[in-house]
Amino acid sequence: MQILISDELLNGTVTNQFEIHLSSNIVSVKELIKMRVTKEIEAYNNRLPEYFNGLVAPTDAERTLNGFKLKSKQVIDAEKQVYVALDAFQKNGFFILVDNQQLEDLDEMVRLQSTSKISFVKLTPLIGG
């Protein structure tokens, strides 16, 4: 089953969309994050564009308006990015909505349909203090 993943801002503006393939309609939150991150890293590594527009910043990357700019064009380690993304989820760096219901635990099982709306909403830390 193909399912559409959207990156959204808090106001609902979609900033990125792509599809992933699921072999089952029931997945854990952890599996969903892993599949999403792996897909975006594979897409980046196949093209090596100037900017990486993914869920979490790769090592040695600078945040810019266009995404994360790596100091040199290089292949990103997908396994490492998955680990960083799972950690960010647990630390509320982003949250996931499936059909407008927030997912809260990595082990939570989710039943998806081809029409399910999956949104990853990245939280931007406040600057200052």
Regions found by a protein language model. Give the residues of each.
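Ubiquitin-like/PB1-type beta-grasp interaction modules and other compact soluble beta-rich domains
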Residues: 1-129
